[in-house]
A protein has these predicted regions:
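Acidic-histidine catalytic/liganding microenvironments
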Residues: 23, 109, 250
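Short, charged, surface-exposed secondary-structure boundary motifs
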Residues: 37-40, 135-141, 205-211
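PAPS-dependent sulfotransferases, especially Golgi type II membrane carbohydrate sulfotransferases
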Residues: 1-4, 194-281
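PAPS-dependent sulfotransferase catalytic domain
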Residues: 100-199
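A conserved segment at the C-terminal end of the G1
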Residues: 14-26
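The Walker A (P-loop) glycine that initiates the GxxxxGKT/S ATP-binding motif of P-loop NTPases
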Residues: 7
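PAPS-dependent sulfation machinery
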Residues: 29-106, 112
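ATP-binding Walker
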Residues: 10-11
Length: 281
């Protein structure tokens, strides 16, 4: 089976992934827009397995341990078969028995509004929410957060994500809060229909590799500790009021923000396609 984790950036999807991938039978892929892109391709592109492999490599944002040739070998079949095959290939690279993989988890914080291909599979969706004040505060601790340090821009950007989340059928999605981790895992596993067989006995998880390459994620593989309330307490009153006011202003705009979400999704896809072409040049 397949699971798709969606969230706004800096909302805890990587923490959730790190917790899930410890569970025996579950393989979590490094953050990738490949499932969304795969579901948007025409038949001509779908028939070019080398091109699909390049899109997978280019669309996976922490570098994937799967090589171009290994990815190409996974590109036969329908979307569901391809996405599951890539999970088994990753399990092999991580020294975990591929024949014991029962659930492959894909997550992204980018091409969030592109649901067509994902909905065509039998996969389920998991949406993780974090207190907006914590998400805003975190923009100042990562270089890629520079664009969202203005409260109003941040609020509109956030609501464009909520627009996308609302377009997923209710019976296909499970929503949880960052503050509910790790206790929410039991309910999540029940929703996914995944038996809890304990933890993998050996082998590294994908998030271990990600943490080695992304300095801002170096705490995800340690024991989970939620310090969000302390981080909120450090925000000055003026900032809190500005963010709350901006969020209140932007919330009624949510139903109208589909085009903004499509714009950002389109920019991500264009960048991925460009990188894929460079890989094959």
């Amino acid at each position: 089976m397949l699971t798709y984790i969606l969230s706004t950036p800096r909302s805890g999807s990587t923490v959730l992934t790190a917790l899930l991938e410890k569970k025996k039978g579950i393989i979590c892929m490094p953050e990738s827009s490949f499932p969304q892109i795969l579901g948007s391709l025409d038949q001509k592109e779908r028939s070019n397995e080398r091109w699909l492999a390049a899109l997978y490599i280019a669309g996976t944002f922490p570098p994937t341990p799967i090589t171009l040739d290994e990815a190409e070998a996974c590109m036969g079949g329908n979307d569901e078969e391809i996405l599951f095959a890539l999970g088994k290939a990753l399990a092999t690279k991580l020294s975990r028995p591929a024949d014991e993989v029962t659930e492959v988890v894909w997550k992204t914080t980018r091409t969030i509004g592109m649901h067509k291909g994902l909905l065509a599979t039998k996969g389920k969706f998991v949406i993780i929410h974090r207190n907006p004040l914590n998400v805003f505060e975190s923009q100042f601790r990562v270089s890629f957060g520079k664009g969202n340090r203005n409260p109003l821009r941040f609020a509109v950007f956030n609501e464009s994500y909520q627009n996308a989340f609302n377009r997923i059928p209710q019976d296909r999605k499970y929503e949880l809060k960052y503050d509910d981790l790790p206790g929410a895992l039991d309910g999540l596993l029940d929703f996914l229909g995944v038996e809890d067989y304990g933890e993998w006995p050996d082998g590294k998880g994908a998030m271990d590799l990600v943490a080695e390459r992304c300095s801002w994620l170096n705490q995800i593989t340690s024991e989970f500790e939620n310090t969000d309330s302390l981080k909120r307490d450090r925000l000055d009153t003026k900032t809190v009021n500005q963010v709350n006011t901006a969020m209140a202003f932007a919330r009624p705009l949510r139903p109208l923000l589909g085009p903004i979400r499509s714009y950002f999704d389109g920019r991500s896809v264009s960048s991925i396609r460009s990188r894929a072409k460079t890989l094959l040049a």
